[in-house]
Amino acid sequence: MAIVKRGARSKAKQEAPAKSGIKKAEFDLHKKKEVGVSDLTLLSKISDDSINDNLHKRFMNNTIYTYIGHVLISVNPFQDLGIYTKEYLNMYKGKNRLEVPPHVFAIAESMYYHLKSYGESQCVIISGESGAGKTEAAKQIMQYIANVSVDDKVSTTSEITQIKDMVLATNPLLESFGCAKTLRNNNSSRHGKYLEIYFNPSNYQPVAAHITNYLLEKQRVVSQITNERNFHIFYQLTKSCPPEYKQSFGLQGPETYVYTSAAKCIDVEGINDGKDFAETLQAMNTIGLSKAEQDNIFRSLASILWIGNISFVENEDGNAAIRDDTVTTFVAYLLEVDANVLKKSILERVIETSHGMRRGSTYHVPLNIVQATASRDALAKGIYNYLFDWIVERVNISLRGRAEAMEKKTIGILDIYGFEIFEHNSFEQICINYVNEKLQQIFIQLTLKAEQDEYVQEQIKWTPIDYFNNKVVCDLIEATRPQPGLFAALNDSIKTAHADSDAADQVFAQRLSMVGANNRHFEDRKGKFIIKHYAGDVVYDVAGMTDKNKDAMLRDLLEMLSTSQNTFVNSVLFPPDLLAVLTDKKKRPETASDKIKKSANLLVDTLSQCQPSYIRTIKPNQTKRPKEYDNAQVLHQVKYLGLKENVRIRRAGFAYRTTFDKFVQRFYLLSPKTGYAGDYIWNGDDISAVREILKSCHIPDTEFQMGTSKVFIKTPETLFAMEDMRDKYWHNMAARIQRAWRRYVKRKEDAARLIQNAWKVKKHGNQFEQLRDYGNGLLQGRKERRRMSMLGSRAFMGDYLGCNYSSGFGRFVLNQVGLNEHVVFSGKGEILLSKFGRSSKRLPRIFVLGRSSLYIIAENLVERRLQLSKEFVIPINSINYVGLSTFQDNWLAVSLHSPTPTTPDVLINLDFKTELVTHLKKLNPGLTIKIGPTIEYQKKPGKFHTVKFVRSDVSTIPIHGDVYKSGTVSVRPGLSPDSQNPKRPRATSSKVDYSKYYNRGGRLAPARTVPPAHPTSQQRTPVAPPSHATQQQPSYPTPVAPVHQQPNNHVRKVPPPAPSLNNNHQEAVTAATAAMNHVNIQQPATVVQNHNSNPTAPSRPAKKAAPAPPVKKTAPPPPPSLSAAKPKWPTFKANYDYDGSVSGSMALSANDIVYITQNNGQWSLAKSLDESKEGWVPTAYISECPPPSNLGGSKSPPPPPPPSATTRTVPEQGGNAAAAASTQQEGGLSNGLAGALLAKKNEETNLAGSIADALKKRSATRDSDDEEEDDDDDW
């Protein structure tokens, strides 16, 4: 991850600069774990089964929404998932579709955004079978648009607020009058509606609305299938009407009326009719229906219910007669007509004959029971149908507002009945399925057309996809020429036999053979016919179709209603012109098929003028139970909805596409050149930013195409990888913040602990050093000391294995052997173990000293696993004495008062023997310490053994060890027995640069390498290496400011650091930042100058100037001989090997020659001859020696030849540097390959030194402010 330079950290929060509409990235708190794929175009395998499987996975995870591009797939959950709350609504407000999970709110937000941004009217087409959730989806879209368009924070007029409330109130009102409980759905829409919301073009707030009604199912008023219900309003009214209505309209419970009880379903689980009736009344009041209008509505509903209770008996002539005249009398009271006129209109039919233009005779023909029942039901259906139409028109009057005087920008919501297949299908089903065929046709056409237009507009190559065009089925139903369709055949049958319904049905059955001729989507059967719809094959019954197609009330009934004294009946519901249409013999009345055909075509024209959105709803089961998923049923819906073809069309070459700005908004975090700390920093245009992001993610060119305004991603796996990288970015940033915070807290704790320890040492002294001095006093003048024991940093810490910690190896040891006491001392060493018949052997052991006993623990491998066991347990009070030699060896004998075979004397070899003896003495003050040339102990109880110690300088003896053989220990000479530990040396800085451990979160990137620097005419000279804090600084030339590469103009630069009073600090910050940025920088060059010239810093590279005229110059004098150079510091030779294990020290091998720059007694500051390493070494290990003969180089190179008169010279400013470069180049060639390698090594070493020096300077300056935290995280 590249590090961008920035100034010193300020406590004042700095706002990120705004950039071209790209918002600062935010972590999505609401994002759920993805189950399946959220867009079906991202499926690896495209098939009906894979689509069904993906929908199943998401449904079981309560994720009911899935995309196909911009099409939303919704699976009805049959339960409240809590995903339509105010919190969810705000989550989708103003968000791009890619930023949030699939939801119906995302479709609504997209519609409203395009309306505002492009001024295009929008519509949403919601399709699916009955019970799939179309009405609920329409309600949620209305709820969302009403809320986002009327923002609470923006001042709105009372009229706009009223329009919003009325639009929302249409839902409960029309649901009560237009929805019913069916076998498949408890709230099935038995009509279609298209709601258009009109918006003000200036602020896009709703100012009006309009509802178009389609094909109410009138037949449901008079009859329902068993276990279904009539329209909701009848049950609401009969269960919850106020007492005044019960008294005035004679209303009783729903079980009283035939129309509400015949299907044997009065109550429905999950429906509260009383509560719904209260919402219906509230909706009426919101829309503006007056009390008189409401009374007339409920009076009409009561009359329909009582009409259904009119029953018939057969009289003496075999004609129908009223069974109970009180019922017809009460119906006449409700309709405010004469009771005899009502009975006559139901029981008789008036027939007029004509003779040409002359009026004929009039006949009153009595009806039988079947005919009278049909007349009764026709009256009830007619009243309800015209009442529903009037309610819709009355709502439109209230919603009209100011729409007529303004430019119309609308959002349309289509909620229409779904495809229906029943056991017996009649005229209602063919009309419903015809409308769904038209919607499927416009869906295919608009989807494919939009897809084709997009590829052409974006200049993207793609392959056309074959699909089923259902226009042939639509023509089968609606066509008039050249071959008439079903609707035309129905109308012709009515015209041929208008007086007899049975005869008209027979004529229609005969004409079916002509309708379906040569059409493979039609089959004619006796009394039935089959149409192969896109959703499946449906069998329709011929019987009754022609009668239902007439869609007109009998003239007798209309004439009876025109006599009503109620103006709502005779003028509003049944105006006089309605009767005039029936009496006009020159014009054929409009049939139901004519109306539905006209409405469907007008709907298609309206939708074609809008920018469409689509919601395809799916019903998961027939039992309406949550968490139940019928695979076969859903698979059938997936097939007939054409989801696979929709996916194939959408994925015609590319699985994902979006505009450049949205792509950048989503993924700019993935490139260090476009995103920094969550901010967008790219200065170029969006298309170049897209290319940079794809390049940083290493997406090959074959995986994407760039259009004119969109980027197209070919495979879903590419998008998945980028989304995964984006998710990891947030996790890595969170982890980085956590690390930085933990590091900050740890540093504070360490600093506090350091201050506390320093205060304790200052006040009470260092207890570990005091213990060390006490132990040294026990051996003072009696035993030679090892050099490592006399270090100033040596302290008696005791628990070297960490047994007192809660974890680690020491705790593991205690747990293995079952110890649970405080440990005073722990360490690893050896014991001398005697074997029968063989010489003694040194074996490794672990020593743990508690407050009461010394534990010797053995390590054994059992079945390749480490096992620890207590070998000896020696009570401290049982120790008689401890024996040590007078030499610098590590042997220690522990002799007991009464040794036993299980607890014998032991001979121990331990590096920290003096510390162990000290702790034993502290725990047992009466302990005797014997020091002599020999050590005596009992190998076995009663059998003493003596070990002799001799001093030897044989090279085979280790410097820091000894040799045991046959009871004799040979050891090298040690320090004087009177040696004292020096004062503890001052600790060196241990700051760490953490930035090198960071990698940008989630970005796929190869290992970064530093590119080679561009050649320069100046000779590169490394910056001086860092010096120790206590070392006197030598005088060096001031380094020249580095020259950077030309920056990328597209990347926005973070503001440079503020000017500092310390120039050296500023140079250090610049060098360190450039080093961490991995940019190409010119190494600072040593300026070779005359004694009368001043050094000048180079400026930015200027344009190339014309070459100067040739000037003849003499050759420069040869440089001084390198062999004559004197060393900067005295040279010393190492007499012994030193491992450099102490912090801040430097490792040495015997005979190494180093510089010594400082000596404080026991320790000396050493530096290697090439000045690449520096550290402390024991003064006792080194001795002064003359410098080596090859120090500083070998034979001086010969002077270069003088330049030719024709040779061009460089400008005067760089002339000396060029000469020096030439000199060094020739010298390097003369020295051969070894010299070149050595020069390369020195250059790398000095470069590292310059970076380290710069980092130290920057850290020192920052540490001067205690309030500031080190900036060691690169964002």
Curated annotation (Swiss-Prot):
Domain IQ residue range list: 731-751, 752-777
InterPro entries for this protein: Fungal_myosin-I_SH3 (IPR035535), Kinesin_motor_dom_sf (IPR036961), Myosin_head_motor_dom-like (IPR001609), Myosin_TH1 (IPR010926), MYSc_Myo1 (IPR036072), P-loop_NTPase (IPR027417), SH3-like_dom_sf (IPR036028), SH3_domain (IPR001452)
- Which residue positions does Phosphoserine occur at? S361
Pro residues: which segments have biased composition?
A: 1107-1121
Identify the residues that the record assigns to the TH1 domain, covering every copy.
785-974
The organism sits in which domain of life?
Answer: Eukaryota
Give the record's keywords alphabetically.
Actin-binding, ATP-binding, Cytoplasm, Cytoskeleton, Hydrolase, Motor protein, Myosin, Nucleotide-binding, Phosphoprotein, Repeat, SH3 domain
Q: Which GO terms describe its biological process?
A: actin cortical patch localization; actin filament organization; endocytosis
- Compartments it resides in: Cytoplasm, Cytoskeleton, Actin patch
- Explain the post-translational modification: Phosphorylation of the TEDS site (Ser-361) is required for the polarization of the actin cytoskeleton. Phosphorylation probably activates the myosin-I ATPase activity.
Q: Where is the SH3 domain?
A: 1127-1187
- Biased-composition ranges for Basic and acidic residues? 1254-1263
**Repeat among the record's keywords?**
yes
Family indicated by similarity: Belongs to the TRAFAC class myosin-kinesin ATPase superfamily. Myosin family.
Q: What is this protein called?
A: Myosin-1
Q: Which organism is it from?
A: Meyerozyma guilliermondii (strain ATCC 6260 / CBS 566 / DSM 6381 / JCM 1539 / NBRC 10279 / NRRL Y-324) (Yeast)
The organism's taxonomy opens as:
Eukaryota, Fungi, Dikarya, Ascomycota, Saccharomycotina
